[in-house]
Amino acid sequence: MLTREDIFKHVKEKYGTSPDYPWEKYPNYASLRHTSNKKWYGLIMNVLPEKLGLDGHGEIDILNLKCPPEISDRLRNGENILPGYHMDKEHWISIVLERTDPEGEIYNLIEQSFHLTK
């Protein structure tokens, strides 16, 4: 299982970026931004599973990433990769971190999102 801390460490090492927390109302929502233009390339949120149409109790961490529509359609499986929560559902996906194992795959999706949002 990949954690938000794993992602923060990865993006710091790979892109030199650190999360920021733009919403006082949601202090654990962490945006991942380009240092040059401040555009988001990722957003980590803690949400209730039912907000995503999932079963479960207690908040879960999700990672929103930008993704080309032709790829996001293939990735979405209704369990751990979903249409982007509170984002353009065609171009963004939400990844349920606790239900996702292959960190290499997630890191590849982060890299793709990083380049798509430059």
Swiss-Prot record:
Transmembrane segments: none
Cited InterPro entries: YjbR, YjbR-like_sf
Pfam families cross-referenced by the UniProt entry: YjbR
This protein's name: Uncharacterized protein YyaQ
Organism: Bacillus subtilis (strain 168)
